[in-house]
Amino acid sequence: MLVVVASLSHIEPRDAGAQSALPLKYTGKPTQPAITADDAMSRVYIFADDSMMGRAAGHIGGIKGTAYIEREVRRLGLVPAGDNGTFFQAVPLFTRTLDTSSRLMADTAALTVVTDYAPIHAGGKPRPLEGLKVIYAGSMTDQSSMASPEQAAGKVVAVSGPTSGVARKYPGAMGFIVFRPDATMGQIRRFATGPATQLRSADDTAAKPLTMYVPVSAAPKFLGVPLENARPGTVGRTLHGEVRYTVVDAPARNVVAILPGSDPVLKNQYVAIGAHNDHLGMRRAGPVDTDSMRAFNRIASQIYIARTHELPDLPGSGLTPEERASIKINVDSLRAIRPLRLDSIYNGADDDGSGTAGVLEIAERFAGAKVKPKRSLLFVWHTGEEDGLYGSEWYTDHPTVSRDSIVAQLNIDMIGRGGASDIPGGGPAYLQLLGSRRLSTELGDLVEAVNKSYPNPFKFDYQFDATGHPEQYYCRSDHYEYARYGIPITFFSTGGHVDYHQVTDEPQYLNYPHLVKVATLVADVAERVANLGHRVVVDKPKPDPKGECVQ
């Protein structure tokens, strides 16, 4: 039996949303086998340091981050399970950058790339636009009145409103135009002109529809009439020209390690435990004052939550112009009395420095145990999650152990927050759970049983696991790449917060006792699964591994 290394009854997390008393920089002591807040803090401060440059997949920061993980698993004595006897599995990513000399015309009028249209390409080779008509299909908010798929076939389909499901509704579209309010185009334009990271695949050269985001003011250039005068089925201009991209290889790497099991037969089966090692890199628009940005986003989120009782899609979004102006006055006052702390690095302390540290803590606990679990433990730190789950997609398509030998996968992504001021309903016992019963009732029951065995158990929040939930969290982290092959999974997360995908996601704002409590739960679940006398029973339908994820 493994030694109990963390008594959950003695873990009393502070509210992670409160003003942090932790330092900007911290150097901890060498880590020990016990899963402790001090060890987790030491790891996150290293992994989410500015020197890691935001850990973007396919960039030097990603190399630095994975090198740190590799040093740790080597020190722990784990077995390499990557390529050619190493801990690394190469993932063939590449970047695709818009060629701003691309030329496109609507009838005889020249269109200005980025200004009139901001193309976002999802992969493959853009379908040719030469000689194609634009058709306005309507708004996805009222699908009953939209143009039919037959009307749209072979044309560039223009829509307004939300875009979810547009590609499924119009499979014969040669391209898509999405109209957006002029005021929202800034971020889209920056994204369109930056390099997009993608995964090499067999259909790299397959023609796929290009999506162009167009400001409402430019709608007449494509439709021939203002957007407010367009009706579903309106056929507009004819496009001429092409949109071109420059492609550059940007290889990245997963880190893969094994703790061999103790049973001579069951050690050939694996319980996978994972997190993602990448984040967003550097802010393309340049440095911002970190403290005033955080102050703005905190106030903005409080206003949005009070109005809607849910988190905004991104911190600072969902406000009226009047609300933004009011907050800016307060933030300008703060900036006037405090020195600027300029920053352009997306440190990703919670996303997913917390998960990476948690998995390392779990690995060190089992590596230091006198009695090992019966089944082997497979630790995978995936790359490319932020760009599209690429590392986990590559690993599950090219596993370094038999895919059928993986009995379950436990995914940890963002486990360092969850306070009352972070998320509605948050607190010391808060934890989101997704997917635990989507393939295996037994796995879901086992997670619940382990949790209930603690003196101070978590209160699991299952709301984001609901079928059809608009956030689609089940489809948005690495666990799904395992689930698509019928491997039972559970996704553990403390959820979103004001620093999500901001340069303010820094180590000093994490709740390390809460992180440790989650990591201990995951370790105990992994141990239970690894010591079962049978494989976790799959009693639910398996998805199509090549199909689209639908929650």
Give the predicted meaning of each segment.
Residues 113, 200, 209-212, 217-221, ...:
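Metal-dependent peptidase/peptidase-like ectodomains
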